Amino acid sequence: MIDAPKKNLVKQKPIQALKKQLLLNLETPIQIDPKITTAAGIDMRALLVTELGSYYQGSRDLLKKILDIDPLYAPKAVNYYSLLTDKLIISTVENVINLIHPISNPTNSEKICVLAVGGFGREQMAPFSDIDLLFITPYKQTAWGESVIESILYILWDLKLKI
């Protein structure tokens, strides 16, 4: 009986460090270095897929390690998984609009709203579940808007997400 608390303390120290790292991942923005984006011959879509994929896989690995140590963390992990996916979607949209399809003077027809629906929208997303997104555009959509949505979807598909 005396050894049991020691074992719990040993298990809690690594899990606390993992949880801190997970929170840090959620708080740290996913940004592409502006120096890289201006270099000639850079395939921005491939760069985004690499950077976003690295972030997402690293964060998922952290969640898996936490769950391996503490299976009772599952309800929180579902919320964190949704938040990580949310951050990935937001970063994808922002980077596509700012780096791949920048527009200096957008009109009212060049606006896009992305909504999360289903389990993802409720922040109850299980690992490997599909991601339900709703794109809302103005009645008169432009070629720019179609290109942005297409690029967002291709990047998310390249990340092996089920959209």
Language-model segments: which ranges?
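N-terminal regions immediately upstream of nucleotidyltransferase
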Residues: 1-111, 128
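Functionally constrained cores in energy, signaling, and assembly domains
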Residues: 77, 82, 92, 135-137, ...
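Catalytic metal-binding acidic patch
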Residues: 113-148, 156
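Catalytic nucleotidyl-transfer cores of nucleotide-processing enzymes
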Residues: 150-163
